[in-house]
């Protein structure tokens, strides 16, 4: 028989294990483990009577949890076992209506099902119910598909089916696979998930995968990296010819999918997640004013390549005095934050680029008051006259307000009216975009949001924008910003894939077929002398407000941030509680950055009576920085 002569129902394909996933140091993160599986594939000539007999035979031989057997399934089993009896439940009038096509055969079947009584079903014992469940599994989905009857079969069950394939008429065994996570829950959310044999292609992804040649019962990546790199990770199916004696002839061998190597350092990732868990719980248990604080975010990058070395977010839920920590890493991609003063490096760039400030420009740090609005001040009072570097070192809001008014060409006097053109907002946003703030990073994950772009052009909002109190950005955008600043204005695309290896069935990895090179996606259009000035400001921060934020890492540079934020306290979709959020961005060593760090702690303070703010953000940042330096060294 040539392949062209073989009927479709004589050929079938089996799922092949997916490619493995490794970290940057070739530590195996995700592997496949063999699972003994019993399945059923109906032959065209098999009658319903034979199927029922097979179901009872298998009920005697395999241990199967049938608790998922629905009442409808049991009624269907009763119907096929008692056709004559159930047929009598249909009246002559109903049969006449069917002949007249006033009702359908489907309506008749529904009437039959409705009229099967609980008393009739009560005659079924445990074995009957088990057989009913097996019969249901045998007939679930399309008749020509393989139906999984049992996974994780015992050695005895596996051997029995294997030895009695001929008489079991459609039942067979195979070694299926499941994903095995060698580091437990560490980074597991972002590694993603794969559909099961039972679920096959999820409904919402059906059109996409069917258009790519998949079958409905194929196992596919359904989230994050498993979904993003489905085309690489999926294996090539083995194809078999079903012989008359129920044996198989191999037409084409299957092969495991491509192994992929990630940019993540799993040992660093593990440490970051542990530090987050410890510090978040400690803050909730022991720090005042943390009513609405429930977690923090961390991202570590290599600024010269865009490689993500670690990324984690944890969320704590307090229930009856018990602290339960959950993974919240997707929030790094989808939950915008109010950044606060960490944007001031980008804000200084606007001032330099437009020529309204220069190296050494001094301004008095004082409250700014626009008519009919509250005074806007720096967090620290009495800073006096500051130049551009000290304005960053001491996080002067007034310096940014006055710079913004100059950018807008506005005439300001205390408590007077202030008018600014819409173009001033766009001047800021254009420069912020060069750093990656306000645009998707296009990181290689399937979900990402933009953040919020304010729609009002009131003059006070321009001043807010200059200190990070207007537009909001996702944590990955903020990571892109500090990475760009650390890389001297070169913006590299953030990414998680490092290498792709050739498909193989061996334990040993195949040769590298693709190396992911750093992708330069933009540059900050600013003279080098001004870039150097901002870097000097960031270095000065670490000797003042940011002291200790990067632990004992040598030659750090960074920027602290405090933001006025809001929280939805009752889950009604409206933000109703004013809070304070904390942020820190940095890199080290400043003269040759090996890593950049982003740490964000939204809603870290809430109080109407106390100014106390939990040090959780600085504690996380300090511990993580030390750990990064220790591991990278």
What are these language model-derived features?
Residues 146, 245-291, 296:
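Conserved, well-ordered alpha-helix/loop/beta-strand core segments that scaffold catalytic motifs
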Residues 28-31, 238-253, 264, 290-340, ...:
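Beta-lactam-recognizing serine transpeptidase/beta-lactamase-like catalytic domain environment
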Residues 49-60, 159, 163, 188, ...:
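Solvent-exposed, polar/charged alpha-helical surfaces in well-ordered, non-transmembrane soluble domains
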Residues 1-227, 231-247, 252, 296-297, ...:
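Membrane-proximal periplasmic segments of bacterial cell-envelope enzymes
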Residues 507, 615-633:
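Short, gly/Ser/Thr-rich active-site loops of penicillin-recognizing serine hydrolases
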Residues 46-49, 284, 606-611:
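A generic structural signal for short coil/turn motifs at secondary-structure boundaries
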Residues 45-66, 275, 325-343:
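Short, solvent-exposed cationic patches
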Residues 603-621:
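A short acidic/glycine-rich loop-to-helix N-cap element
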